[in-house]
Amino acid sequence: KESMGAYAALFHQLGYNVLLPDARAHGQSQGHYIGYGWPERYDVRKWAKRLIRDHGPKSQIVIFGVSMGGATTMMTSGLQLPAQVKALVADCGYSSLQAELDYQAGHLYHLPMLVRIPVEGALSVINRVANGFFTQSASSTRALHHNHRPLLLIHGAADDFVPTKMVWQNYRATQG
């Protein structure tokens, strides 16, 4: 939440109302396990519905997220969303959890493919037990095939945590 404070302040100064929630298992939010955007997409939809309930049907909502929040934003785009959700902004979001895990295993930990495959398989099973889904399910690009809203994708070329190639995969996937 602290890293999003500057964005929230800017949007507020520009006259927008801002909802800045903690994602699952972050900050003051409930939950014991981070879902990497996949279960959180339902939370985002609930927050949008709550905003409409609290501020009226003329509300206009833009969903914005950075990194895992960017992936969450794109994963949310694949759901049936209220008409008041007008646009989405995803900054440095990954194309899929599996692709991001594979990239990190190779880039950060320098694991050879022969080791990565069984490790990632085990992580997927552990995640299924803890979070209720296999890591292969959490895909921004698959969700974006169902998106028809305007989507602004932002990604820096020097990003070494989420590879820049993923923004192009997301761009090609969206219908918005």
Where are these regions (language model features)?
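Glycine-rich "HGGG/HGxG" loop immediately N-terminal to the catalytic nucleophile
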Residues: L14, A25-Y36
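Short beta-strand/loop motif that positions the catalytic acidic residue
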Residues: H146-N147, L153-H155, D159
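Alpha/beta-hydrolase fold nucleophile elbow
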Residues: H55-S67
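The serine-hydrolase catalytic nucleophile loop
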Residues: K1-L10
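Glycine-rich nucleophile elbow surrounding the catalytic serine of serine-hydrolase chemistry
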Residues: G65-M75
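Short alpha-helix in the alpha/beta-hydrolase fold that links the catalytic acid
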Residues: R149, P163-R172
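Hydrolase active-site cap/lid region
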Residues: M75-F134
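Alpha/beta-hydrolase active-site loop
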Residues: I34-H55
